[in-house]
Amino acid sequence: YPVATALNGVGQMSGSECTPLGHHTIRAKIGDGAPINSIFVARRPTGEVYSSALAERYQQEGKTRDWILTRILWLSGCEIGQNRMGNCDTMRRFIYIHGCPDSHQMQIPSSHGCIKMRNTDVVDLFDRVLVGERVNIILSEDSSSVRHNITA
């Protein structure tokens, strides 16, 4: 699946807004059965459904919003001192694999640390994986960016 990762690149630290590297597990699956484009805030559905008109309204009001849509796979680090515990804990950083607006370009860094996917892709992945399954986030071959694909 093509994905989008952090605008700030890779990194482990809280507040960095970077995508963490290394071995993780799926801590929780959130949104099972929710309609495509359902909006989540703090891992809870708001009851809203994303549309370009809603996004435009937010823009006109001068508001910005990081749209977390459709499904959430909440990640937890497995490597103490690397992505688990302390100031580098992936779970406490609220790093997810989640859906985003269909207009969002994949394979271009743009998130605040999460891994964004197309909504239909995140539903497909969500249905294929179980809580506790491993996720390995690695650099691409040129070692300058996170690989912008997920293989299930």
Label every model-predicted segment.
Residues 1-7, 88, 95:
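Histidine- and aromatic-enriched segments that form or immediately flank copper-ligand environments
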Residues 17-20, 67:
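Generic alpha-helical scaffold signal
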Residues 36-152:
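Exported/periplasmic cell-wall-interacting domains
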Residues 2-18, 54-59:
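N-terminal post-signal-peptidase region of extra-cytosolic proteins
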